[in-house]
């Protein structure tokens, strides 16, 4: 991995990942986040999912370069198709750097795989309201969030948990 310095945005996303989580990083983009989390001892196992072959190959190369192929599995797959709930044990999912509409679509398309997942850490670049509406409609509770500025952009990080529905606001 050429650049060992994680962006402030991804560092903040990583701080929400529970200790010893089994992580699926959707749209992993070079596996910077899972590599950082394994190297710092926050997690021991991760899946880095990529849907496009070029970024997938870069992700594979970075994981191999870091010597973490036993701890980080790189998979060429669309969204939540990158993991199997019954065998992979994923309990935390990160999706960062995409639009809120796309993140909601990824979650909707893989909704049947979310039953064992306890934590979603989502960082939409836009469409935050749409994503929040999807989370509320599917009985996810937002337990934490953070807004940060980096490179003249404002980013929002949303942490949500399933099955903890609260009264809806009108």
Feature roles, as predicted:
Residues 30-43:
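Conserved SAM-binding loop of SAM-dependent methyltransferases across substrates and taxa
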Residues 41-42, 64-70, 112-115:
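Short helix-capping segments at alpha-helix termini
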Residues 12-19, 83-87, 112:
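Glycine-rich helix-loop-beta junction characteristic of Rossmann-like nucleotide cofactor-binding loops
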Residues 45-50:
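Conserved SAM-binding motif I beta-strand of class I
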Residues 2-6, 91-92, 101-170:
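Class I S-adenosyl-L-methionine
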Residues 20-29:
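Conserved class I S-adenosyl-L-methionine
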Residues 1-20, 35, 53, 57-87:
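S-adenosyl-L-methionine
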